[in-house]
Amino acid sequence: MRSEGIYFFTMNENSITPPDVLDYWFSEKSKQFWFASTPQVDNEIKVRFESVWEKAAEGEYSQWRKTADGSVALIVILDQLPLNMFRSDPKGFQTESMAVEVALNAINNGFDEELNDEKLLFLFMPLMH
C-alpha cells in the first residue's frame, strides 16, 4: 500500500536492523517529511515503528550503539520517530534522554567522523532540543 509517497508496512521489531531504519529514514521519499510531516505520515510512522520504538525504549537494540550507523538508526528511533508518532503528546519526548546518551557515546567513540552530513545532522539532533 502506498500513501503520500511512503510505502506503508510495519517493521518487525524482532528482525529489524540498522540498515532497515536508515534506508527508510534517509530515502528520498521520507526526506520530504523530515520537517514538514502530515497527520497521515505521522500515523504511518506510528503503525510502522511503534513496536520498534517500544523495544528500543526497553534497551532491546542497545548493541546498535557499537557502530556509527547503528547509533544513528537508534537515535532516529528514540528521538525522531516519537515526535511523529506522538505529536503534541509528552510521550514524544519519553526516550529523548536515551537518544542523548546514544549521541554522546557515538561522539566519544569518534563515530561522528565516519558519517555523511545527513546522518551527522541526526546524530547531533538530540543534543539540539
Task: Please provide the spans of the model-predicted regions.
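Intrinsically disordered, low-complexity activation-like regions
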Residues: 8-72, 77-88, 93-129
